[in-house]
Amino acid sequence: MTIMRKTHPLFKIINNSFIDLPTPCNISSWWNFGSLLGVCXVMQILTGLFLAMHYTSDTATAFSSVTHICRDVNYGWLIRYMHANGASMFFICMFIHVGRGIYYGSYMLSETWNIGIILFLTTMATAFVGYVLPWGQMSFWGATVITNLLSAIPYIGTTLVEWIWGGFSVDKATLTRFFAFHFILPFIITAFVLVHLLFLHETGSNNPSGLNSESDKIPFHPYYTIKDLLGVLLLLMVLMIXVLFFPDVLGDPDNYTPANPLNTPAHIKPEWYFLFAYAILRSIPNKLGGVLALILSILILALFPLLNSSKQHGLIYRPITQTIYWIFIANLLILTWIGGQPVEYPFTMIGQIASVSYFSIIVILMPIASMIENDILKLHY
């Protein structure tokens, strides 16, 4: 008798994606972050759903409805902080996932990579509109400052901003529509995730050696289901330590003050996972230039498959590019730090140097290093 999971039209899809999927036998723990992102997305949708049952998207009651969730709803505080810190875990996993893709040359699976970039942008949009919902000071001013950047677009900018706001300032209409966006976007993300997996399973996974693994594959279950389960347990452990002991460590104290359009916070800054892009935005004195740099800081990822000229797959046997890669990671951490600092000397100067370095490393240094390594290979063989 044939096994049902191999013949049933619905179970067959699940079977071919998560059970009998041929997987390279040597993929390391850096490959766990894809499944961890899936777990994060499910957790965010579930906690978000329960929060939405008690939240009201009205400027008069939004802040107090979040307070009500934390004080009066059974385990509301837990759901709220799991959702807030779950977003941080989501981005940590995403940064590592992208970093692993760059290190091991996974960007050569270009369809999967490009869908990944779209996923990254959609997740950033979801997190941004979500941050506005508690209607604290940083929510309000963050929304005002970031949406106002669109006014830099020539000719249609001002009209576009007022259209997004639903008026002449961030107000009731803005909050209501941001709640609607925040509710729908995770489902759009889920659809993109399925497309991401579809393209991945067309080509098969990359692996740490960068070699073809067609001749040496093992079934996904039980080997990688167990491995992923360990990753999930570690993720949940770190998340719950953050939620139960340090729930506000990644938040902003200003967001515990209700939104007040008449009082501007001393330092307006977004959540920590946007700080690198925010630092790049601030490092350019021109408004339109800053907005373009902000967008390019993410879209530049799409250049990786085009700029790759190396004869080897991944950086595992490429010491020069490897060194540049780790300088790039350090530079990204510097940008994140600068994004949270006030706009004054020496932070502005450091931010400008780090911003130029960010683009230079990707567009100039890495391709040059690849060419040098190719020449070294020719000398040896």
Curated annotation (Swiss-Prot):
InterPro entries: Cyt_b/b6_C (IPR005798), Cyt_b/b6_C_sf (IPR036150), Cyt_b/b6_N (IPR005797), Cytb/b6-like_sf (IPR027387), Cytochrome_b (IPR030689), Cytochrome_b_C_euk/bac (IPR048260), Cytochrome_b_N_euk/bac (IPR048259), Di-haem_cyt_TM (IPR016174). Its main location: mitochondrion. Heme b b566 binds at H97, H196. Its cofactor is heme b. Heme b b562 binds at H83, H182. CDD domains: cytochrome_b_C, Cytochrome_b_N. GO terms for molecular function: metal ion binding; ubiquinol-cytochrome-c reductase activity. Binds 2 heme b groups non-covalently. Keywords: Electron transport, Heme, Iron, Membrane, Metal-binding, Mitochondrion, Mitochondrion inner membrane, Respiratory chain, Transmembrane, Transmembrane helix, Transport, Ubiquinone. Pfam families: Cytochrom_B_C (PF00032), Cytochrome_B (PF00033). It is a multi-pass membrane protein. It comes from the Eukaryota. It is found in: Mitochondrion inner membrane. A ubiquinone binds at H201. The keyword Repressor does not apply. GO terms for biological process: mitochondrial electron transport, ubiquinol to cytochrome c. Component of the ubiquinol-cytochrome c reductase complex (complex III or cytochrome b-c1 complex) that is part of the mitochondrial respiratory chain. The b-c1 complex mediates electron transfer from ubiquinol to cytochrome c. Contributes to the generation of a proton gradient across the mitochondrial membrane that is then used for ATP synthesis. The cytochrome bc1 complex contains 11 subunits: 3 respiratory subunits (MT-CYB, CYC1 and UQCRFS1), 2 core proteins (UQCRC1 and UQCRC2) and 6 low-molecular weight proteins (UQCRH/QCR6, UQCRB/QCR7, UQCRQ/QCR8, UQCR10/QCR9, UQCR11/QCR10 and a cleavage product of UQCRFS1). This cytochrome bc1 complex then forms a dimer. Belongs to the cytochrome b family. Heme 1 (or BL or b562) is low-potential and absorbs at about 562 nm, and heme 2 (or BH or b566) is high-potential and absorbs at about 566 nm. This is Cytochrome b. It comes from Loxodontomys micropus.
